[in-house]
Structure formats: C-alpha cells, structure tokens
Amino acid sequence: MKLNHDQLEIDFPHWLNWAREIQAISQTGLHFAENDYQTQRFQRLSEISAEILGNYTNLDSADLVEIFADQIGYATPRIDVRGAAFRDGSLLLVRERIDGGWTMPGGWADVGDFPSAAVEREVLEEAGFKVEARKVIGIYDANRTGPLEIFHAFKIVFLCEIISGEPRPSFETSEVAFFSHDEIPQVLSGERTRQRHIHDAFVALSEDRPTIFD
C-alpha cells in the first residue's frame, strides 16, 4: 500500500520508520510466539503500528490491522525486480494501467523464483518480449527516492537482452514502447521506476561498471 504525498503531514517521516520497525517486531514475534501471552503482546504491537500510521495518514487503522494480519513469518524486505531492455539504444518501458505512469517492466519476485527468472517472466508478461537477464545494474532501497510505502522493499534492476517478441500490452499495462534517453516520459510510475534507475540503466548500456547498491 502506497502512502500518497497528500497523506503525509511532515516532510521527514521518522514515524514511518518507527511504524515499520514495530510492525516487523510484531510479525516476527508472532511467528515465534510460544504462548497466548506472547501472542497478545505482539498483536498489540501490530495495533500500535497501525495507530501510528493512521494518525499521520488518512489510512484507516482497522484496515491496516487486517493488512498486517496477512503478513506472516519472519519479517524481511520485499523484492521488486525490473528489467532494463534496449533496442537500438532505446529503453523498453510499459505504461501501467493502475496509475498511467511509465515504468521498466517488472514486479514482485515470487517464492521459488530465481531473481533472473522473475524479471524475465515479468518482461514477457507485461511487454511481450522474451529476454535474458545479463547483469545486475543496481540494488536499491525502493523508498530512498520514491513514494513512501508501508512495507520496506528492495529493488533489483537487471540489464536484459531481447531475444524475441513484439510489443504486447497486458492486463496490467496499456502501452509498450521504446524511448531514447532524451525521450523518456515525464510521467513515471514512481513507486516502480525512478529517474535514477533509468539513468543508471543507460549508463550500464554504454559502460562496463560495477553493480550499484544502496
């Protein structure tokens, strides 16, 4: 769940870090709880996290408690994969139906996937191109320069080689197109792709440099 900018009441949200950490402690604690007392205490921590978020946003605390209840097991950051695929020096982007913004194709990695297999599948599903992942361009903290979200996530951007295929939108994407560096659309799907990721992708295409990481 994304926290829209108009939901934020302060510029530097220490409260978001606190709420995330409390929720992570709660989720992990519930996973290892050995008795009803521990379960109740860790459930209360989840409620406190929801109350913090509800106080600083227009999100409903009760809805957040339900969302948190669906998160089970040891709490870790989520993994988002993105494929930077080029044709004649232009970058493949897809337009998201959900917000109308452009992004490199990708999505959450599924359990059981190799990271490379995840990004190759996402590019095929969202854009219609069979690709092979060749290199990790960067590993980013997804919220460092993007919209704030409740759950912490890492973003892995791969340099991919197009093997075959033609542009083909999906139920998630409305358009598929290639853009030179100077033609990149101004309206990006910010929680998925940022200008930083696009810049690094073009650099990786032209230069042999080490993987970038936060």
Residue ranges and their predicted role:
Residues 1-42, 101, 171-214:
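Nudix hydrolase/Nudix homology domain
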Residues 28-32, 70, 142:
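General structural signal for alpha-helix termini and helix-helix connectors
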Residues 37-82:
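Acidic, metal-coordinating catalytic segment for phosphate/diphosphate chemistry
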Residues 65-103, 131, 135:
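N-terminal strand-loop-strand
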Residues 105-107:
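Short acidic, glycine/proline-rich loop/turn micro-motifs
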Residues 109-133, 141-197, 206-214:
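Unchanged
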